[in-house]
Amino acid sequence: MKYIIIGLGNYGSVLAEELSALGHEVIGVDTNERRVDVLKDKIATSFIIDATDEQSLSVLPLKDVDVVIVAIGENFGASIRVVALLKKNGVKHIYARAVDEVHKTVLEAFNLDSILTPEEEAARSLVQLLDLHVNVESFEIDEEHYVMKFKLPGSFVGYKVSDLSLEKEFNIKIIALVKGCLLYT
């Protein structure tokens, strides 16, 4: 797939690098020359422009990409303006980062494909990680595969294994369950 990422701060630059490493074509955009310089050899193309300026934005191949991601963080006004300009220019698939509830509410009015809340998602992931890693025993099969034994987290109680979406959400496959002295495979 082909992406434009506008805003190459911490979040946007990691997003650009990771998508590029997965083989996607990434075009990075930022006003900060240093941020663009850091990524120029890691992504397909980069632009040093002010995406809040409609004329500057017109140099980007907006119609030739699958998704435009607005990764601008703390500059609420810039984020909203860029999203509005993208909509005005007929960009079909827009993802935008929201840094708080008000920002998210305003972005929802644009009817975007996705509103990204990385701080919230990171906190939820950490809670799940902490919840799962209480009393974990593991055995490494190879660099990518482990067998892990852990006590059932309280949040799993009352659900069927199929309802937990462990494989889809965490790439975890249940190979056995132990209840009391009984082993279920």
Residue ranges, per PLM feature:
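Conserved small/polar residues in nucleotide/adenosyl-binding loops
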Residues: 184-185
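Short alpha-helix immediately C-terminal to the canonical SAM-binding loop
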Residues: 36-37, 104
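Short beta-strand element of Class I
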Residues: 25-26, 94
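Phosphate-bearing ligand-interacting subdomains
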Residues: 42-126, 132, 151
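Aromatic pocket-lining residues of Rossmann-like dinucleotide-binding sites
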Residues: 19
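N-terminal Rossmann-fold NAD(P) dinucleotide-binding loop
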Residues: 12-13
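Glycine-rich Rossmann-fold phosphate-binding loop(s) that bind the pyrophosphate
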Residues: 8-9
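Conserved acidic E/D residue at the C-terminus of a beta-strand in Rossmann-like folds
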Residues: 30
